[in-house]
């Protein structure tokens, strides 16, 4: 359960980064500048630097942890949470992000590719660029 909870936390960071980058992009902020400011001030942990760099560069291959594996862990987490009657709305949101990314052909990509859906939802990218 701890591994699932840890992976859940990572996916929520990825989701949050995707939304934040899309927000910044809408206001004309260069993604690399955005990343530099974030990771040199409030968010200095490696997880923000590493996943933020992938999102800023829109490069999700080679995958460190493939998207289908993230979906698998997310499903296991949601099943365990349901069994224990623990609502996890963020996990449900992330689940949908995984499904969308897989539907767009990102099965070989790093699980951080779910961040692309935030860009697409903001009208910034209409198609997957590989």
PLM feature spans:
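ATP-dependent carboxylate/acyl-activation modules
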Residues: 128-130
């Amino acid at each position: 359960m701890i591994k699932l909870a840890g992976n859940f936390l990572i996916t929520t960071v990825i989701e949050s980064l995707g939304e934040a980058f899309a927000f910044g992009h809408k206001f004309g902020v260069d993604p690399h500048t955005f990343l530099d400011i974030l990771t040199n001030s409030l968010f200095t942990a490696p997880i923000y630097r590493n996943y933020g760099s992938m999102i800023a560069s829109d490069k999700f291959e080679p995958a460190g942890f493939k998207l289908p594996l993230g979906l698998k862990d997310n499903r296991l987490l949601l099943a365990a949470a349901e069994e224990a009657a623990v609502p996890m709305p963020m996990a449900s949101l992330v689940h949908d992000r995984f499904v969308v990314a897989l539907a767009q052909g990102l099965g070989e990509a790093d699980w951080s590719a779910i961040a692309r859906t935030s860009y697409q939802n903001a009208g910034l990218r209409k198609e997957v660029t590989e």
